[in-house]
């Protein structure tokens, strides 16, 4: 493809490393980028960039398959998943594969199949990545114009956006079909402590689905993270899938309007920055979801949430002391508030003590004991079931607190188990990665805007001290 502008003019930031290390097309002289700038060398080589992306997808899918099989090989059915450091099998179990009542694993074969399918897929992607990176055409515009593009071709860019949106919409519908037709998904709220069930009565009311988006993100409200029934989750995927598919068709059929052409920067680096910004939002949202939500991330597989473990401890000692003769309705604690039960700011009966801060927790083992005004004293005296006691004792000793060296659990709880909860791992990793992606978004957005405006801030690369130093090799 003929270059329509001077590389020097377009790639504002040049950092000379050592031009003698590389071949033509891969060195600084011919691309304007040093070897470590990675895919920046491929900005105008659509064929090679395709290879890089397909190979990257292959690495991702290879990790998924290999890690999946690793978890299957190490899995012990007698222990809960969250005690074994698993992060992939809980996702498969949540989708209803291999589990039965109470989240008990009945069959690990579906997990094995999942791992093998991902490994085989990664081999196909890996071959495609190597082919396009090394053997295929450098640019696709001449031989395969449908797959070719120029970054500033606004119509082509929105067509590619549309194709991506349609694929995302189909992905959302995969969950819908699994929940509706292919065996159902795991519902932690099923009576008696959770079970796999088909979700038949979807929530499609726009006021409910979009009402989540309008909620406050703070305690008691919790934005979309507060979703607590599968009908809403699956119904939300119907809405999301439909919007993505319709939006994708719209973007394929239309050209950007004048206001959009003016508002956006239309370059490869700008698109990179938009994508990184979106992924940062996904990362932060996923962090909050896995930390607080025990419906999309059932506690049977991921362990209790922090508030859940705390409330479970209060419940466990209420049960114990009630058996020993305490009157849990009137016993006073050291601060003058109720020792076992007290009232929330809005008048509900809640657990007393330090766990009062988590009074708005909802959990399947606790909800049967609530009445119209919070915890029901008569139910606490007469209706507590053995499965509720067992589960709360288990969750009390598995709080999602823990450091990298696995000293987990509540420091003052002598029965706590030494482990790190998958909720801790997943929330921390998604927060940290989301933050890094956000910084990458700011970095690339700044560069893209500076390039579009025709200036850059930074040191003058022509007189950089390193240029007068001896090459490293």
UniProtKB/Swiss-Prot annotation:
> Where in this protein does the record say Phosphothreonine is found?
15
Q: What SUPFAM superfamilies would the database entry show? A: Photosystem II antenna protein-like (SSF161077)
| Location of the protein in the cell | Plastid, Chloroplast thylakoid membrane
One function term, GO molecular function aspect = metal ion binding
Asked whether the UniProt record includes Kinase among its keywords, one would answer no
Q: One Pfam family for this entry, by name?
A: PSII
* Biological process terms in GO annotation: photosynthetic electron transport in photosystem II
Q: Which residues form the propeptide?
A: 1-14
Cite the entry's keywords alphabetically.
Acetylation, Chlorophyll, Chloroplast, Chromophore, Manganese, Membrane, Metal-binding, Phosphoprotein, Photosynthesis, Photosystem II, Plastid, Thylakoid, Transmembrane, Transmembrane helix
What does the record's cofactor remark say about binding? Binds multiple chlorophylls and provides some of the ligands for the Ca-4Mn-5O cluster of the oxygen-evolving complex. It may also provide a ligand for a Cl- that is required for oxygen evolution. PSII binds additional chlorophylls, carotenoids and specific lipids.
Mainly resides where? Answer: plastid
Entry keyword annotation includes Cell division: no
Residues annotated as binding [CaMn4O5] cluster: 367
Role this protein plays:
One of the components of the core complex of photosystem II (PSII). It binds chlorophyll and helps catalyze the primary light-induced photochemical processes of PSII. PSII is a light-driven water:plastoquinone oxidoreductase, using light energy to abstract electrons from H(2)O, generating O(2) and a proton gradient subsequently used for ATP formation.
What family is reported?
Belongs to the PsbB/PsbC family. PsbC subfamily.
Q: What is the name of the protein in this document?
A: Photosystem II CP43 reaction center protein
What is the organism field in this record? Ipomoea purpurea
Traced from the root, the source organism's taxonomic lineage reads: Eukaryota, Viridiplantae, Streptophyta, Embryophyta, Tracheophyta
